[in-house]
Amino acid sequence: LVGSEMCIRDRSGINRLSFGLQSANNQELKMLGRIHSYEDFLESYDAARKAGFENINVDVMSALPAQTVISYEITLKNVLRLKPEHISAYSLMIEKDTPFYERYSEDEYIRAAGGKPKYLPSEEEERRMYKLTKELLAEHGYNRYEISNYAREGYECKHNVGYWRRENYIGMGIGASSLFENTRFHNTCLLYTSPSPRDMRRS
């Protein structure tokens, strides 16, 4: 979202945005198959602030192909300079039967990283990244309230906390899940069978 697109806040009542930055390193973004750059993210983030959004989350990822502890620290510090209200820090997990897994090979990522001999961080490096996340975010006033989620006081994600408390939530759109009075159900995943958002079924 850029520029005038941010006016959705005034029309829809949306008051929180989440940006999937993942990394401030454009080479790492390319290896993840992301189509945005760090500069694109900065432009959108700035537009969101100018539009009046006062509750913003930024996603970052560690243990990426060819990522180092130093490059990850740079990503964290770049995000912290922006002072978002919430930061989600995830460690990459490569799952079978996903597009990322299918195109995952040592040679591909070595080439993409400019000939680096190592394409995934070691377990020791992953642990250092995890420790760095906790310490650096705590130093800047972010409280860890879930495994991967950190927030300034009062900005914990109500949606996430609601899951743990089994609170009611209604999912809108194709394939969206809901929980109401301890009953889980979800919308159809087929567009042509869903003439109305009320077309749901129990699961």
Regions found by a protein language model. Give the residues of each.
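C-terminal scaffold of the Radical SAM
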Residues: S4-E5, R9-S194, R198
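Basic polycationic patches enriched in arginine
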Residues: R201-R202
